[in-house]
Amino acid sequence: MKSILSQLKTAVSEALIKAFGEDLKDTDPLVVPASNPKFGDYQSNVALSLTKILKKNPREIAQSIIEALDIADTCENPTIAGPGFINFSLKPSYLATLLKEVQQSDRLAIEPAENPQKVIVDFSSPNIAKEMHVGHLRSTIIGDSIARILEFRGQDVLRLNHVGDWGTQFGMLITYLKEVYPDALTKADALDIGDLVAFYKKAKVRFDEDEAFKEASRNQVVKLQSGDEESQKAWQLLCEQSRREFQKIYDILDIKLTERGESFYNPYLADVLTALDEVGLLEEDAGAQCVFLEGFKNKDGDRLPLIVQKSDGGFNYATTDLAAIRYRIKEDQAKRIIYVTDSGQAGHFAQVFQVAERAGFLPDDVEVVHVPFGLVQGEDGKKLKTRAGDTIKLKDLLDEAVNRSRADLEKRLAEDERQETADFIEKVSQVVGIGAVKYADLSQNRTSNYIFSFDKMLALQGNTAPYMLYAYVRVQGVSRQGGIDLSTLPTDTPIILEEAAELTLAKHLLQLSEVLMSVEQDLMPNRLCEYLYDLSRKFNQFYEACPILKAEGDRRISRLILADTTARTLKLGLSLLGIEVLDRM
């Protein structure tokens, strides 16, 4: 079914044409959820926007719209407030009818997108020979959630992992390993990621201090780039070692990705320069090939160049990103390309997108968008680090979340004198620990920095994953207590919405599709988190105010349907955030 918001927008659009003629057929009906319940459920200020066009008083325009509206089955009589706002209050009978559709649908009656597109979500993107750190957490979690929501909406999503698998660091690392540990370049599993990172750090020190080593490293890069068999094999072994470590993290987080690293685009880099030259954008500056940017200037007021080929003939990130855009549009046929990286790269992407547009790489029907996110901070408000001042490894952070979740659970079990199996304790600890980390990140406006606090994210109260999971568990508890299989509730029993808490919950349950459409457009997963938090609160209020199992007849079944629909909505919503649910905690 179409969302309530979509239905009301259509109704207001039709009323505008009926009242004022075809000239207004493309007018935005400006229907939004009401800012305050005292104004009803939805509002439109379209009458105010038409005063100049129609040369009429906005209240008079609003009255004409109301008289032309055909929503008697949907809403109570609309009212006019203030200078000309139209307020809509939904009828309980209409809500009950929609909830019956939701009850009988695997998708909660949420329609997929009318015109699905090929969408690429580029996220996570760690570097080979380096461990994933807390900065990769945000890209991985936010990108995964965006991909899940787009997939649920019916878009054809390609999830790409643009790993850093190319560049001078490999010449440096291979040269160093040849000296100190040649087995690592010929034997799989000769070293683990921790060793690889340590070797990388030592190689970097040598590179910075030893000119002969620096020269040997650069020669090694040339050999690698020219396809030298021994160098290629060594490079592939190093990549494979890192890949296995990345996969361990992705398995813990339940992340699905297609790897397509920087090296994939190597054959297409020269073509980028040719294409830029053909449209007259390529210029030489201090021996480098570049494109001078519009709107980007240095401190002297001169236009900034985007370098696409260095003076030594090497290519860089900008060249690779331009090649990737061309490939993704021409070969993958993408209509929307989403890049999920930290906000520090906003300038880079703005420059790359500008050059791609000016060069004609971007057709009018293709959207490229950077989805930036802020820093993860410690409780001191500074960038999250270990006590020794090092970057926190992602694996260590996730292990800590699960361990703390386990400790909280074991403490509760002891206080309640509850006995549970080791398997139960392990499962709950994993789901709550990992879910808490994901939700704490996703519930923030992604553009903001956020304070990482295990105590806050694992709390059973407040806007946390455990609070949401507990609301779901509560419904399953009703099922167990009443000996009721919620999946077999009758579909012909009317839904009764007489109590205020029933009505409030029903309205909220029917807003999920509006929220998902909003996230699909604006790529802000925190809106889904806010919706789920409000849903959990409204359900808990309903649970306290409206006894479920003590009710009788149709009222009992109606409340069971409301509870089950809440649980199904929580399960779907949390799954779109990459979070599992539990029947018991």
UniProtKB/Swiss-Prot annotation:
Belongs to the class-I aminoacyl-tRNA synthetase family. HAMAP family: Arg_tRNA_synth. A motif ('HIGH' region) lies at residues 126-136. Pfam families: Arg_tRNA_synt_N, DALR_1, tRNA-synt_1d. It comes from Picosynechococcus sp. (strain ATCC 27264 / PCC 7002 / PR-6). It is found in: Cytoplasm. This is Arginine--tRNA ligase. The gene is argS. InterPro entries: aa-tRNA-synth_I_CS, Arg-tRNA-ligase, Arg-tRNA-synth_N, Arg-tRNA-synth_N_sf, ArgRS_core, DALR_anticod-bd, Rossmann-like_a/b/a_fold, tRNAsynth_Ia_anticodon-bd.
